[in-house]
């Protein structure tokens, strides 16, 4: 009889433990910035609005992710993250800092938001994920400001490839993070690359490109670093900006109450069987 009871209880335990896997199945989420409302109108071609931190909030939170921003009231400058839906692909220079070179967000839906990053003087973690969020990747492209600067040159930065087109220029985004085991990893993505032997292969990214970030594991703080072959006395000459949209993450929920109860029953069964063995031995 005891063996029959034990078998039935253990069968129930097996079912509950198998349920643990289902309870912990990951599901995908997307940080798409659509719950945010840009507050400053852009007066250039295409119109649209942007937010650059001038309200002094120091950043924004959306879909469980925190994006840091620093705004300097003295100079009206900013660094870290902003968000925008401007669509100017033709105006060069710093007045057009908030437009993706695609002229539209990743979903190709006019008026939708995306994020724009401007590198601080000292790169530091600027994107923090909520607990249990594991980054999978994001869609990334150039800003119009950076792309036209590399394509044509300007008063501060060179034309990529130089006059002949043979100079091996590049513009690199490095995304790094440290996982829960203390392991640091970096993912590199070239926003422009003119290092090819055949100049026809040289490129400046002008579409939304998927960047796989699974190598970063469960890192909760991400650091973004921009570097370029065009460096002068005061550092990098290439405008230190890029655009990001639809950051994809997986999220593992906490164990459910059912699983917790199941574990308790399993322990209770073990105690029950031990007492039976002791009773039979007496």
Where are these regions (language model features)?
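N-terminal targeting leaders for non-cytosolic proteins
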Residues: 29-126, 130
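Extended extracellular/luminal ectodomain segments enriched in beta-structured repeat modules
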Residues: 130-137, 219
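C-terminal membrane-anchoring or membrane-association module
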Residues: 270-282
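Short coil-to-beta strand junction motifs in C2/discoidin
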Residues: 150-173
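Sec/Tat signal peptide C-region and signal peptidase I cleavage site
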Residues: 22-28
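Terminal, low-complexity interaction segments
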Residues: 34-37, 167-251
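Bacterial N-terminal signal peptides
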Residues: 11-21
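A short, hydrophobic C-terminal helix/tail in secreted or cell-surface proteins
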Residues: 254-272
């Amino acid at each position: 009889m005891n063996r029959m009871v034990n078998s039935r209880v253990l069968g129930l335990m097996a079912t509950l433990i198998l349920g643990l896997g289902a309870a912990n199945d990951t599901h995908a989420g997307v940080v798409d910035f659509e719950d945010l409302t840009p507050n400053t109108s852009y007066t250039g071609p295409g119109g649209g609005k942007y937010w650059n931190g001038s309200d002094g909030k120091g950043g924004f939170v959306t879909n469980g992710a925190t994006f840091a921003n620093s705004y300097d009231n003295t100079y009206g400058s900013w660094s870290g993250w902003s968000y925008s839906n401007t669509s100017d692909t033709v105006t060069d220079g710093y007045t057009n800092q908030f437009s993706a070179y695609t002229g539209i967000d990743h979903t190709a839906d006019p008026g939708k938001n995306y994020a724009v990053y401007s590198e601080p003087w000292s790169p530091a973690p600027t994107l923090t994920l909520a607990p249990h969020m594991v980054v999978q990747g994001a869609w990334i492209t150039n800003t119009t400001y950076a792309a036209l600067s590399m394509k044509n040159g300007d008063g501060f930065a060179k034309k990529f490839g130089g006059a002949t087109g043979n100079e091996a220029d590049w513009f690199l985004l490095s995304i790094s993070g440290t996982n829960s085991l203390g392991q640091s990893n970096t993912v590199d993505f070239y926003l422009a690359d003119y290092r090819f032997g055949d100049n026809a292969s040289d490129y400046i990214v002008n579409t939304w490109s998927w960047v796989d970030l699974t190598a970063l594991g469960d890192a909760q703080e991400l650091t973004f670093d921009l570097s370029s072959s065009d460096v002068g006395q005061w550092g990098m000459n290439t405008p230190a900006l890029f655009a990001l949209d639809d950051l994809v993450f997986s999220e593992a929920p906490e164990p459910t109450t059912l699983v917790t109860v199941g574990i308790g029953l399993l322990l209770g069964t073990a105690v029950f069987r031990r007492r039976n063995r002791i009773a039979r031995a007496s």
